Amino acid sequence: MCVLFSAGATGVETYNPDVKVVIHVESPHKGTMVTWAENLQNNNVDYDILATSYYPYWHGTLDNLKQQFETVKNTYHKDVMVAETSYAYSLEDSDGHANTVRVGNNDNGADTTEPFTEQGQATAIRNLINTVNEAGGLGVYYWEPAWLTVGNTKGLTGDAYDAQVKENQ
């Protein structure tokens, strides 16, 4: 992987040396970000920012995220950020397809500290933003806020995108 990351970074730097090179890892839990940072350094990968996805029901506590960010910044001298996150505001199935977060699947547990309501969503995201800021992170990208359900799309033709477009016309 490091050979591929180095090639990608070289391509970016060749095209425009002012563009920041970001490596996005899937998870910050259980020391994953620190392990990535160590491997990237040991393999001389030239990058600027180590980013991660963060979903509390999969990736652990905000305290863990903060610790991972601080270790990467202080030990490996790289900027950090959350490149992908979201938090459900409802567990309701409104489109006939299984939700990623649903009753019996990631809807409870120690790392899910806010209810799946509009206020719970707002609080969870605000807490994440505050944690990233406290750890010296660059910021947070909310993943796909346009994924709004459009009701039951069964029976419509085309792929899911076409079905949503047709439903909303």
Predicted regions and their residues:
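Conserved, mostly hydrophobic/aromatic
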Residues: G8, L50, E84, Q121, ...
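Aromatic- and acid-rich polysaccharide-binding/catalytic face
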Residues: I23-E26, M33-D63, T71, K78-S90, ...
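Structural recognition of alpha->loop->beta junctions
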Residues: L40-T52, D111, P115, N130-L138
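Active-site cleft segment of glycoside hydrolase catalytic domains centered on the general acid/base Glu
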Residues: M1-L40, V45, G60-Q67, T157-A163
